[in-house]
UniProtKB/Swiss-Prot annotation:
EC number(s) given by UniProt: 2.7.7.-, 2.7.7.108
UniProt catalytic activity: L-seryl-[protein] + ATP = 3-O-(5'-adenylyl)-L-seryl-[protein] + diphosphate; L-threonyl-[protein] + ATP = 3-O-(5'-adenylyl)-L-threonyl-[protein] + diphosphate; L-tyrosyl-[protein] + ATP = O-(5'-adenylyl)-L-tyrosyl-[protein] + diphosphate; L-histidyl-[protein] + UTP = N(tele)-(5'-uridylyl)-L-histidyl-[protein] + diphosphate
UniProt keyword annotations, A-Z: ATP-binding, Magnesium, Manganese, Metal-binding, Nucleotide-binding, Nucleotidyltransferase, Transferase
Binding-site residues for Mg(2+), renumbered to this chain: N262, D271
Enzyme class: transferase
Enzyme active site: D261
Binding site for ATP: G92, G94, R95, K114, D126, G127, R177, R184, D271
Function: Nucleotidyltransferase involved in the post-translational modification of proteins. It can catalyze the addition of adenosine monophosphate (AMP) or uridine monophosphate (UMP) to a protein, resulting in modifications known as AMPylation and UMPylation.
Source domain of life: Bacteria
Molecular functions per Gene Ontology: AMPylase activity; ATP binding; magnesium ion binding
Cofactor names: Mg(2+); Mn(2+)
Name of this protein: Protein nucleotidyltransferase YdiU
Length: 495
């Protein structure tokens, strides 16, 4: 790979080429005296940026918001959306600044600062992000990528001593996020709600041409009928969203704020706020302290994904005024999700395929884990040990070890029906059952270290989370049960 200096990155600011109504051009108002806490060489490689640039003043200036991206076009985008099921009207990038788009070896990547100051869309916000939430977002995107789940990426984390008032006084930070696009469901809702079909068409054409060109081609992504391109777009987004929900469920991930303005049109995990990877398994686990009704609980995420797709379809109705055709596309969501989820869970259980009778086997395990407070990640990981003949670590996760053992006997009988060798089965299970996930207490340890100016915990976590399925000697503490003090940790929308 040919490494490039920051000033030599090739830019292609495609979103900025849209009509002016889609955004506001502006300059960030970043925190004072910024310091680079961490930069991500893996993300830099996506745009061909030489990691040697991390130590330059130019890198700090650009990714703190004190200087523009060379060749970029800084702006904040407008969008609308439903928040907690209620129409919230116009929203937009209230503390995010799109610096520009870079053409890298892996395609185009938009670079966006989060926390670099107010925009016309800040509403009652101050445009700031705090250290706590910025460390969590920086780590989460890389953790999800390591798990193989579609996500935005993190490039840089800059900190400042500027005070920021939240529930308490915290300090400011700026995180640089990367994605092929930050267009959301709410981007389409905005123009639909404003009854501006011309802008809606411009946005749809932009998304199709840039990311779903197959929707222009009959027999590829374009569906039959007069509005085949728009229906094809909805079908593609529906499929990606269903697959994303299956990914989340399979690793015990809760997003926490599945508002339509946080739903990526590309099926990426977007906007890491009060997210969480489950420790003790609960079917109705709520990771967001602000979600008092449990709208975005773990077991509701797939249905919320579909609800959000209905809002997207409603916004596309002007371009494809055929309710039955739109509904027919959305009717395909459940089958895609179920097949994908069952496929992922079959792998986690060591099954070559998911048969109808396996539904009961899986449901009984989840109910047992729920009733007995078993750890989600370790319960599945230790199934591989049980297959190797070491059942006790799995059974020890349950209060009623006999009940866990009885369930495992049923799984072992199911395994016997396909005749696969135990070692090969266990190895395959380890490849889909992570050992390391970004538990809240691990993120908290990294936050506390970062507050002292120490990025060492971030380094350790990135090392582990980039290879979450492979045991790495010397890091047992990062793969164990959450400590008792972790039960008191709460995350909310306050960041």
């Amino acid at each position: 790979m040919k490494w490039l200096r920051l000033q030599d990155l090739p830019t292609d600011n495609s979103f900025a080429a849209l009509p002016a109504e889609f955004y506001t051009r502006l300059q960030p108002r970043p925190p004072a005296a910024p310091r680079l806490l961490h930069a991500n060489a893996e993300a830099a490689a996506l745009i061909g940026l030489d990691p040697a640039e991390f130590s330059t003043q130019a890198f700090l200036d650009v990714f703190s918001g004190h200087a523009p991206l060379p060749g970029g076009d800084t702006l904040a985008a407008v969008y609308s959306g439903h928040q907690f099921g209620v129409w919230a009207g116009q929203l937009g990038d209230g503390r995010a600044h799109l610096l520009g788009e870079v053409r890298g070896p892996a395609g185009g990547w938009e670079l966006q600062l989060k926390g670099a100051g107010m925009t016309p869309y800040s509403r009652m916000g101050d445009g700031r992000a705090v250290l706590r939430s910025s460390v969590r977002e920086y780590l989460a995107s890389e953790a999800m990528h390591g798990l193989g789940i579609p996500t935005t990426r993190s490039l840089a984390l800059v900190v400042s001593d500027d005070p920021v008032m939240r529930e308490t006084v915290e300090t400011a930070a700026v995180v640089t996020r990367m994605a092929p696009s930050f267009v959301r469901f709410g981007s389409f809702e905005h123009w639909s709600a404003r009854r501006q079909p011309e802008q809606l068409r411009v946005l749809a054409d932009y998304v199709i041409d840039r990311f779903y060109p197959e929707c222009r081609v009959a027999g590829a992504g374009r569906l039959d009928g007069e509005h085949g391109e728009i229906l094809g777009l909805l079908a593609a987004v529906t499929r990606r969203t269903a697959l994303l929900m299956a990914d989340w469920q399979a690793v015990g991930f809760c997003h926490g704020v599945m508002n339509t303005d946080n739903m990526s049109i590309l099926g990426l995990t977007l906007d890491y706020g009060p997210y969480g990877f489950m420790d003790t398994f609960q079917l109705g686990h709520i990771c967001n302290h602000s979600d008092s009704e449990g709208r975005y609980a773990w077991n509701r995420q797939p249905s919320v994904g579909l609800w959000n797709l209905y809002r997207l379809a409603s916004s596309l109705h002007t371009l494809a005024p055929d309710p039955e055709a739109l509904r027919a596309v959305l009717d395909g969501y459940e089958a895609v999700f179920t097949q994908a989820f069952h496929g992922r869970m079959a792998g986690k259980l060591g099954l070559p395929q998911f048969l109808p009778e396996d539904e009961t086997l899986l449901d009984d395990l989840l109910q047992l884990m729920h009733q007995q407070g078993a750890d989600f990640t370790l319960a599945f990981r230790r199934l591989g040990e049980a297959v190797r003949g070491q059942r006790q670590p799995f059974e020890d996760l349950f209060i009623d070890r006999a009940a866990a053992g009885a369930w495992y006997d049923r799984l072992a009988a199911r395994h016997a029906s396909d005749g696969r060798a135990a070692q090969a089965r266990a190895a395959a299970m380890d490849e889909v059952n992570p050992l390391y996930v970004l538990r809240n207490h691990l993120a908290e340890q990294a936050i506390r270290a970062a507050a002292r100016g120490d990025a060492g915990e971030i380094d350790i976590l990135l090392k582990l989370l980039r290879n979450p399925y492979k045991q790495q000697p010397g890091y047992d503490a990062y793969a164990g049960l959450a400590p008792d003090w972790a039960a008191g940790l709460e995350v909310s929308c306050s960041s």
